[in-house]
Amino acid sequence: MLYYKYRKIINDLTWIIPNGNLRREVRNIFKKLLETADKIDCFVDKINRIDYIENKDNFVILKVAGGFTDQILTYVVGKYIEIKYNRIVKYDLGWYKFHGMDDYNLNKRNFDLLNVFPNLDFNIATEEEAILYRTLFYFKTSIGEEFHNLLNTRKKLYLAVRPNELECYYSLKNDFNKIFDFDKNLSMKLSGGGNKKTYDKIISSECPVAIHIRVGDLLKDLKKLDRNYFFKASEIISKKLYPKKPTFFIFSNDMNYVRKNIINSKFKSYDIEFVEENDNDSGFMDWYLMFKCRHVISSVGRFAVTVYAFIDYEDKILITPENIDKI
């Protein structure tokens, strides 16, 4: 891509502009010009090949990136497009080949969706299709008016869709709950180790509550999320569930930090279980164990909120940094 090839030169040239807003505007103009040049080069090269045969099919290609939650949500959007718009949907997995790291460049993200759900109707775009569509028909959008307008007016689309994907899930909830049969596909992976013991504790608990603490979120946004947030959320749920007694199952990507800084002496009156069996390569097992809980306390990320959406319990409770003062 020409823009990324010349990005440093563009930044150096525009840096001499003293006004920040004008500097950004000029930089965006350069970016648009180079993106347009990319599209023209790609299109001309494509149709000028001797072996070129015009493809009459019009696809919607979705960019797949991120961890297990993002993969589920992208598939939800794809299936929604197939059902609601009668479009052919393909998925671009190139991100896992060329980047494949989390937001903090600490942990590798694996494409686990088809390992967990091997029977999904999942049409993977070829590398050539992905490059062509990404170069010529790319739109970054969220679920909303622009999203629906694009699907109604464009024959060929390459979409990077975030956020609001759960709107697609809720509109076809019964269909997606059948597609994603977590018990059928993940209960067999419990084996006889720590995950099976945790599973047994969860299903035998009177009120199992999952607390998801992604440490990166804590360090990134301390104003919204600190150790007091999780204690306050635990107090709220305990009062709502009284006289039943909750058991709190702690899930985190850095349990040492959690033990030292968050789940401290304030929690001594609560029944606490630390779930430490799974590493970065088996995050889908944390997903399943949280899915078996009835209630969820979420950090800033999408993981816990998405798990909560799939939990089949009528009186389930979700606490997030956004709603904690409204519950």
Show where each model-derived region lies.
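Secretory-pathway luminal glycosyltransferase catalytic domains
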Residues: 46-52, 57-58, 99-245
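Short beta-strand segments
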Residues: 91-93, 212-213, 247-252
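Short, flexible loop/turn elements at secondary-structure junctions
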Residues: 66-67, 95, 163, 215-217, ...
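Boundary detector for helix-to-coil junctions that initiate low-complexity/charged tails
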Residues: 1-43
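Conserved aromatic-histidine-acidic binding/catalytic patches
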Residues: 62-70, 221-225, 246, 281
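N-terminal pre-catalytic "stem/leader" segment of glycosyltransferase-like enzymes
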Residues: 46-94, 98
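Donor-binding and catalytic core of enzymes assembling or modifying cell-surface/extracellular glycoconjugates
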Residues: 68, 242-324
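Short, charged/polar "capping" segments at the starts of alpha-helices
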Residues: 97-101, 219, 254-261, 325-327
